[in-house]
Amino acid sequence: AGDIEAGKAKAAVCAACHGQNGISQVPIYPNLAGQKEQYLVAALKAYKAGQRQGGQAPVMQGQATALSDADIANLAAYYASLPADGQG
């Protein structure tokens, strides 16, 4: 499991598209708050490996490439810890 506080510190870049509290204001960008931790890890690793296509995949591949495995685990832990409704 990742470090929630370390993930929070790294999340500023993510917030530009996915919202400050993990709730996106832009319909084409998914909410990250409340997502399952293992799903987020798998998704980021797939982007990093170039295994996801379509939509915003080129943007996410660029973002994920800059992340270490520890960064991915920490970001996933942070977003999984947030309430899915954006409250709290």
Swiss-Prot record:
Gene3D superfamilies hit by this protein: Cytochrome c-like domain
Recorded GO CC terms: periplasmic space
Modification after translation, per record: Binds 1 heme c group covalently per subunit.
Residues binding heme c, per UniProt: C14, C17, H18, M60
InterPro entries tied to this protein: Cyt_c-like_dom, Cyt_c-like_dom_sf, Cytochrome_c_Oxidase_Subunit
GO-annotated molecular function: electron transfer activity; heme binding; metal ion binding
Family: Belongs to the cytochrome c family.
Function: Electron donor for periplasmic nitrate reductase.
Assembly with partners or alone: Homodimer.
Protein name: Cytochrome c-552
Organism field: Marinobacter nauticus (Marinobacter hydrocarbonoclasticus)
